[in-house]
């Protein structure tokens, strides 16, 4: 079975507060991209283990891979005994904030549900995937959404304008944990602008969108990898886009 795993961008991202569980309460706008990984998911009839492989050798595919975690969580929830092979044809950049690992996990779940003919509500899927990673519930929805808290609250919305996106990634990557550690070290103040940005998208108000789009993690990321600022400076020479 073939499943596509779509990348996302955070058009804006705010951090509201720290959580007792070590995560952060977020408020962000996530938009799906056409860029996607392709997963081949199949049942293993005579196996006592699951296998995840990938054509990008930089991807960690051990037991801590999100696809492995998803399969184990699904097995515990629904009690099935079957095992699976998942092969990932990787197109989404690693360590680029595009949610590739989360998208792969969500695609794996969709494949398992279809192969085993599991009847599950969207609420069940959101609850299950929220235990795997903050971006995985959105990857199940895969629509423009305001995403809140730990990623489990999704507010889908629609807008008409079609956007072209240029993705530029430095050769080096950044881990999410590394960026949030730097954010906590430096301190932060919530911006509370997500509603205004959503409204500007819906109303096709490009000027308001340009004035307010932001990512609170940008500062920590640039502190760790200054090359990001160099890329922004180059892109800012083309004033018609959002950087």
Predicted stretch roles:
Residues 1-96, 114, 118-123, 159-160, ...:
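ATP-binding N-lobe of GHMP and related small-molecule kinases
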Residues 28-30, 136, 152-158:
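A generic local secondary-structure boundary/capping motif
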Residues 46-60, 108, 130, 205-214:
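Short, basic/glycine-rich phosphate-binding loops at helix/coil junctions
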Residues 87-116, 134, 241-243:
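Glycine/serine-rich anion-binding loops at beta->alpha junctions
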Residues 105, 109-146:
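Contiguous, small/hydrophobic- and glycine-enriched helical/loop subdomains that border
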Residues 141, 146-241:
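Conserved, helical-rich catalytic subdomain that frames metal- and/or nucleotide-binding sites
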């Amino acid at each position: 079975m073939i499943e596509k795993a779509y990348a996302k961008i955070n058009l804006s991202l705010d951090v509201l507060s720290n959580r007792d569980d070590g995560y952060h309460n977020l408020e962000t706008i996530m938009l799906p991209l056409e860029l996607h990984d392709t997963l081949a998911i199949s049942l293993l009839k005579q196996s006592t283990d699951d296998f995840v492989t990938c054509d990008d050798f930089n991807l960690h595919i051990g037991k801590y891979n999100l696809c492995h975690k998803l399969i184990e969580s699904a097995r515990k929830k629904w009690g099935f005994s079957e095992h699976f092979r998942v092969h990932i044809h990787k197109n989404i950049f690693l360590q680029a904030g595009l949610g590739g690992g989360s998208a792969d996990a969500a695609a794996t779940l969709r494949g398992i549900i279809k192969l085993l003919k599991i009847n599950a509500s969207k609420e069940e899927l959101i609850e299950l995937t929220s235990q795997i990673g903050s971006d995985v519930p959105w990857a199940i929805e895969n629509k423009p959404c305001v995403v809140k808290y730990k990623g489990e609250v999704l507010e889908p919305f629609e807008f008409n304008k079609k956007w072209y996106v240029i993705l530029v990634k430095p050769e080096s990557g950044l881990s999410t944990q590394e960026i949030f550690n730097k954010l906590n070290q430096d301190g932060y103040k919530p911006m509370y602008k997500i509603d205004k940005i959503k409204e500007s998208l819906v109303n096709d108000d490009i000027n308001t969108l340009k004035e307010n789009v932001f990512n609170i993690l940008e500062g920590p990321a640039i502190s760790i990898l200054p090359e990001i600022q160099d890329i922004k400076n180059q892109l800012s020479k083309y004033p018609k886009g959002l950087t």
